[in-house]
Amino acid sequence: MDQKRLTHLRQLEAESIHIIREVAAEFANPVMMYSIGKDSSVMLHLARKAFYPGTLPFPLLHVDTGWKFREMYEFRDRTAKAYGCELLVHKNPEGVAMGINPFVHGSAKHTDIMKTEGLKQALNKYGFDAAFGGARRDEEKSRAKERIYSFRDRFHRWDPKNQRPELWHNYNGQINKGESIRVFPLSNWTELDIWQYIYLENIEIVPLYLAAERPVLERDGMLMMIDDDRIDLQPGEEIKPRMVRFRTLGCWPLTGAVESNAQTLPEIIEEMLVSTTSERQGRVIDRDQAGSMELKKRQGYF
């Protein structure tokens, strides 16, 4: 990695650490959202650097849908234990009672009940006034126009017309009772930055990001890795072993894999350099309705 690139990554690192420390100093009860993906791994690594040699002054929160990959759950528990982090796990009890299923109820309803409502329940339950998230501006168009400090009203809704200026890295965290801020320390990072930083810092990631032969079903143009037996095959469908990896991770029925032979971090980085598609092209929730992500964020989604 050349010196110019290394300096760029260190600048991003310094900015993110500054934001994390600013939030810890400014807010009474912050929390770090932990979705187990590569961005969460980088954000957690930066937070540990920000307060080293001390422990994190806030807990991790995972809003569980019950449909994550098994390797993600194993990685989550192992990571929290290894770093001595307080891990809070919340699953929407109403969604569980209703038996919400992405295959039966569809991605939009599944996401709304198990993710959006589940997140709002958790934030209300613990009274968090600031929540870190690993979203980046290069991921998706609605995230591209969102500030680092994303103001949410007492119903956790986001109004893109009601955003605060952030001139010269000055952030306005003043809120009224019941309101909160979502904070995105990785806003200015790109997918390539993330992978190069993971390589530079030797950050552990979920093995699903690396190519391997996995059981895959092709449905509606998406390569779905079959992670358990909660699926009914349609006529003519067949599960076949294919060399795939994931660029983004979520609920396994709603997250498409990509065909790839990249089995190491340098190979992933090389793949990123020639990629012309978004990493979220395989996320069903981003295209289940017009303006999908912005609509979800207006309703309280991250």
Curated annotation (Swiss-Prot):
<keyword id="KW-0067">ATP-binding</keyword>
<comment type="pathway">
    <text>Sulfur metabolism; hydrogen sulfide biosynthesis; sulfite from sulfate: step 1/3.</text>
</comment>
<keyword id="KW-0547">Nucleotide-binding</keyword>
<comment type="subunit">
    <text>Heterodimer composed of CysD, the smaller subunit, and CysN.</text>
</comment>
<dbReference type="Pfam" id="PF01507">
    <property type="entry name" value="PAPS_reduct"/>
</dbReference>
<comment type="function">
    <text>With CysN forms the ATP sulfurylase (ATPS) that catalyzes the adenylation of sulfate producing adenosine 5'-phosphosulfate (APS) and diphosphate, the first enzymatic step in sulfur assimilation pathway. APS synthesis involves the formation of a high-energy phosphoric-sulfuric acid anhydride bond driven by GTP hydrolysis by CysN coupled to ATP hydrolysis by CysD.</text>
</comment>
<protein>
    <recommendedName>
        <fullName>Sulfate adenylyltransferase subunit 2</fullName>
        <ecNumber>2.7.7.4</ecNumber>
    </recommendedName>
</protein>
<dbReference type="GO" id="GO:0070814">
    <property type="term" value="P:hydrogen sulfide biosynthetic process"/>
</dbReference>
<dbReference type="InterPro" id="IPR002500">
    <property type="entry name" value="PAPS_reduct_dom"/>
</dbReference>
<dbReference type="InterPro" id="IPR050128">
    <property type="entry name" value="Sulfate_adenylyltrnsfr_sub2"/>
</dbReference>
<keyword id="KW-0548">Nucleotidyltransferase</keyword>
<dbReference type="GO" id="GO:0005524">
    <property type="term" value="F:ATP binding"/>
</dbReference>
<keyword id="KW-0808">Transferase</keyword>
<dbReference type="GO" id="GO:0000103">
    <property type="term" value="P:sulfate assimilation"/>
</dbReference>
<comment type="similarity">
    <text>Belongs to the PAPS reductase family. CysD subfamily.</text>
</comment>
<dbReference type="InterPro" id="IPR011784">
    <property type="entry name" value="SO4_adenylTrfase_ssu"/>
</dbReference>
<dbReference type="InterPro" id="IPR014729">
    <property type="entry name" value="Rossmann-like_a/b/a_fold"/>
</dbReference>
<dbReference type="GO" id="GO:0004781">
    <property type="term" value="F:sulfate adenylyltransferase (ATP) activity"/>
</dbReference>
